[in-house]
Amino acid sequence: MIYAMSDIHGCIGELQKNMEQVDLGGDNRIVFCGDYIDYGDSSYYVLKYLWDLQKKYGAEKVVVLKGNHEQMFLDWIEDYRNIYSDGTEDCRTFNDWICTDFEYGANTISTFISEQQMDFLNQIARTCSMETISREAVRMILSNHEKLIWWIQQMPLYFETKSQIFVHAGVDEEAGEYWMWGASDNTLLGKFPATKGKFYKTIIAGHVGTCSRDLAADRSYHDVYYDGESHYYIDGSVYKGGKLLLLAYDEENEKYYQVENGRMVLVKPTGI
């Protein structure tokens, strides 16, 4: 059995509940398809949970792919790591990520630092620029979690089997079986809109909510989306009140199931 989850977005309770339904015995394994941070209130704890799980079972059994939110987080850290290390500020600064995080009450940053450190950031935010806040926050995060940040940096962008490609957003399907040779990080992490139709391998991805206009086109739909051809989308918009979806692929009968509340329901083409 191969399990898959994506777009956890800081929702540790939902992750733990889903993992109670995962059997990692035998040859079973699980692939996490990115976007573990932001929006929810437990970003660091989600990453730590996955890191510990991978250390327990090994990287072949627990595959943790990178999402665009992890990459934005890393870009922000790298920019301000450079500023902090050489004392200059004449380089590009990636403020999009931290601005979004502060719009959500600093839900992500606050989980990586102590309460006292967060109080300090809130205090200087009254008079200091976002650049100054970022510089201090990066210094704190690297001091607290340098090994974890290194682990995030090493996350692969896709995982391939004989018949499947697990990825955060998608691949360049126009390239056919040569997709990996021209695959840009932007495509793998941020492809939009979601692709549907026939491909030579099955694509399992997140990134785009299954309720979105490009998929089910139904705001109340938060189950696995299957296009009836080659694509399974598993972002159930958990942080918006949807679901953290758990997909299971039975390698013996080559069928996909949505696992929920202890039941395995065969995934059928959506809307048909």
Where in the sequence are the language-model features?
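Feature recognizes metal-dependent phosphohydrolase scaffolds
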Residues: 1-272
